């Protein structure tokens, strides 16, 4: 398991991400083949739920595109389920405080870094039985700073 976004960012280059708001696995598959660095399945404002996201993430797995998800909320259950499904990046909305951000990050990573529980059924199928050993180094966690409160707390959040 290797997340190519980290290689792109180490070279101080920009990565190009596509956004999927409508639940359609064919569209996800097509976007995966178009050369995007990553594709995000939007579960917050898009029409995607967990069930529709499964097929979309499966379709993206047949490409060199990094599958990502914007979750509906900073909640451990859906974050961990999406990571177990095999996404390599989570975007969390409404991160307003340092505490919000610390909780979010902890949900994305296995101990000792975080508190993610172990259950990567599909992720192990896609990335191998040693997924657990490499996951923490290959998961992107992006916090959305989108409110006045978050901007006021930005230094503390970072």
What are the functions of these language-model segments?
Residues 1-158:
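Expand to "…catalyze enediolate/carbanion chemistry for C-C bond making/breaking, isomerization
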């Amino acid at each position: 398991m290797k997340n190519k976004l980290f290689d792109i960012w180490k070279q101080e280059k920009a990565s190009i991400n596509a956004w999927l708001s409508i639940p359609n696995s064919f569209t996800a598959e097509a976007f995966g083949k178009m050369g995007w660095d990553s594709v995000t399945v939007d579960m917050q404002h898009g029409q995607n739920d967990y069930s529709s996201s499964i097929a979309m993430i499966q379709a993206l797995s047949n490409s060199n595109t990094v599958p990502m998800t914007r979750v509906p909320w900073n909640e451990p259950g859906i974050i961990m389920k999406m990571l177990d499904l095999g996404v390599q990046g989570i975007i969390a909305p409404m991160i307003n405080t340092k505490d919000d951000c610390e909780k979010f990050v902890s949900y994305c990573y296995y101990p000792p870094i975080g508190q993610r529980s172990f259950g990567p059924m599909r992720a192990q199928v896609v990335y191998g039985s040693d997924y657990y050993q490499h996951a923490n180094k290959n998961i992107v966690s992006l916090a959305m700073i989108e409110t006045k409160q978050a901007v006021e707390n930005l230094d503390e959040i970072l």
